[in-house]
Amino acid sequence: ASDVYKRQLLLVNENNATQGELTRIADVICHEIAHMWFGDLVTMKWWNGIWLNEAFATFMATKAVDVFNKDWKRWVQFGIERSAAFDVDSLHSTRPIEFEVISPDDASAMFDLLTYEKGGAVLRMLEQYVGEDQFRDGIRSYLKKHEYSNTETSDLWDSIEEFSSIPVRETMNTWIFQPGYPRIKFNNNDKK
């Protein structure tokens, strides 16, 4: 968040900057603008939900920058950049994205790779799973219902579920409240 005030991110010469530098600048600006909705307009009730503010800002920054410049292929980079979070998430010492926060150290621990990177990736997966229009309608509903108030993660899942035939809360709880990857059980009764 403090990057947005660094001189090199605000005073850039487009002719001398690399694509990586320009992408980083656009990402940071869009990330901070996304906080106007997730973090400012709607704020989480407690620190355990702060991941949603940061993950949503990470996800929306990529979405906005991809629209701004398709040549930068932000969704390809998004997948590559998130791989480190999934590596950390495969360790036995990993934690869930959302966990009970009872101390200042717990709150500080929320600002890590899993919050930003895995959280952003999980939101992208949800958007692809329920459909872009349904996801956007759910986000709009959530922001309208909870503007200038405090929410919990489940409030977002419930809003998206209103526009989808998928049990969003049930699906997302396995990704958010369990460490690591959720187990998927496949049963092929068709024998094909």
Predicted regions: what they are:
Residues 2-192:
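Hydrophobic alpha-helical and helix-loop surface patches within well-folded domains
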